[in-house]
Amino acid sequence: MSGLNLTVRVHPVVLFQVVDAFERRNADSHRVIGTLLGSVDKGVVEVTNCFCVPHKEHDDQVEAELSYALDMYDLNRKVNANENVVGWWATGNEVTNHSSVIHEYYARECNNPVHLTVDTSLQSGRMGLRAYICIQLGVPGGKTGCMFTPIPVELTSYEPETFGLKLLQKTVTVSPAHRPKTVAPMLDLAQISEAATKLQSLLDLILKYVDDVIAHKVTPDNAVGRQLLDLIHSVPHMTHEQFTQMFNANVRDLLMVITLSQLIKTQLQLNEKLTFLPTA
């Protein structure tokens, strides 16, 4: 498959590890590089993990601890055998002269490696994210070269990652002086209340958009209209009494689960205290 047809999907844990490696870099290091781990399926490169590779860049050469990279990859394979080398990453907002040398190494480790750059300097006010593949150039029998060509890149996340990101966002609006060191998950009922409140605000936003379109205040968007039509068709047809009965049944089940989990927690705490109780 041609590398130009690839699309890169990056998970949040990758960005966190890149930023952590950048913050822990040596004082004389201008950028940090590392290995991207993930999988390739039907033209989609899904990057789910990564690790840093210590290196030094000189004017005419690059020194990288390749044995360290191999050891880290072997250790990761013992934990998750489904993650393979799919490319490499580097901090910064551009491709440097040394990038082609590093890319040659990863081209021996996997087919069509992708190169991901993460702008940790926040020059544009955001963490710029770009993905490239290397296209070989040259004429038969002559000198050959390569050119880094941008390919589409997007952020994606699993459901647990999305839940964790929502918890982290709760500390964004808090001042550093009052920002908590830990964030505990909300109780189930509190999550339902927050989700219902957010759903209500989104419905109000949709209704305002529809009213503005009808009043010719906003130019209609066909794509939005199709999505709204699909949304309406996805709503199950039921009466108000049926919905109330189903909702109450789900709430009762949720309350039962909460009660049982609290009983189990109390039982475990009591058992722990009895275990360490001194005997006469």
From Swiss-Prot:
Extract the Gene3D superfamilies matched here: Cytidine Deaminase, domain 2 (3.40.140.10)
- UniProt-annotated location(s): Cytoplasm
Read off the Pfam families from this record.
JAB, MitMem_reg
Q: Which UniProt keywords apply?
A: Cytoplasm, Initiation factor, Protein biosynthesis
User: Residue limits of the MPN domain?
Assistant: 8-138
Q: What binding partners and quaternary form does the record give?
A: Component of the eukaryotic translation initiation factor 3 (eIF-3) complex. The eIF-3 complex interacts with pix.
**UniProt-recorded name of the protein:** Eukaryotic translation initiation factor 3 subunit F-1
